[in-house]
Amino acid sequence: MARFLVALALFGVVAMTAATGDAPKEWSGKPWLGKFVAEVTDKSENWEAFVDALGLPEQFGRAPVKTIQKIYKQGDHYHHIFALPDKNFEKDIEFTLGQEVEIKQGEHIAKTKYSEDGEKLVADVSIPTKGKTIRSEYEVQGDQLIKTYKTGDIVAKKWFKKVANPTEAPAQAA
């Protein structure tokens, strides 16, 4: 169960999901808002060392998979939708900048706090029962989103290509 939580945190998906009402979805205003895709062949750096440092089982993150990150604002909240289409997985994370969100999975509680550092979106995840912390930074350079992951002294990166600023958020998974 703890490995599952670490895997979720690794992909930036540890948070609560909640209804947001009828506020319009905003896809612009921050450089990190939009839809970004990492294909199987896209660039990554130091990924296996990072996965090893988290103690994840083989099925999490070793083989390259298509990954989609969608981040938009709705009212006072943001949504970070993380999807692995080949694994039929999608998670919608609702967050407010600067506020910690907790999620309980079995006996474990993971805490996530999103904030801004200049033009970057930062997600700090703590899983106290595993003694793990993960920092993810989302930085846009041109038409690319560079996601930098850090745990302990291990740093890894993945590059995503900007696809678009959609006009509608996708339907939420149950």
Curated annotation (Swiss-Prot):
Residues 1-19 form the signal peptide. Its main location: secreted. Secreted heat soluble protein acting as a molecular shield in water-deficient condition. Tardigrade-specific intrinsically disordered proteins (TDPs) are essential for desiccation tolerance by forming non-crystalline amorphous solids upon desiccation, and this vitrified state mirrors their protective capabilities. Keywords: Secreted, Signal, Stress response. The keyword Calcium does not apply. Residues 72-100 are annotated as: SAHS-c2. Trehalose, a disaccharide essential for several organisms to survive drying, is detected at low levels or not at all in some tardigrade species, indicating that tardigrades possess potentially novel mechanisms for surviving desiccation involving tardigrade-specific intrinsically disordered proteins (TDPs). InterPro entries: Calycin (IPR012674), Fatty_acid-bd (IPR000463). It comes from the Eukaryota. Residues 113-162 are annotated as: SAHS-c3. The gene is SAHS 68234. It comes from Hypsibius exemplaris. This is Secretory-abundant heat soluble protein 68234. Residues 26-57 are annotated as: SAHS-c1. Induction: Expression is highly induced during desiccation. Belongs to the Secretory-abundant heat soluble protein (SAHS) family. Coiled coil: none annotated. Disruption phenotype: Results in a significant decrease in survival after desiccation but does not affect survival under frozen conditions. GO terms for molecular function: lipid binding. SAHS-c1, SAHS-c2 and SAHS-c3 are 3 highly conserved regions within the SAHS protein family. The lineage of its organism: Eukaryota, Metazoa, Ecdysozoa, Tardigrada, Eutardigrada. The keyword Secreted applies. It is found in: Secreted. One of its GO terms (cellular component) is extracellular region.
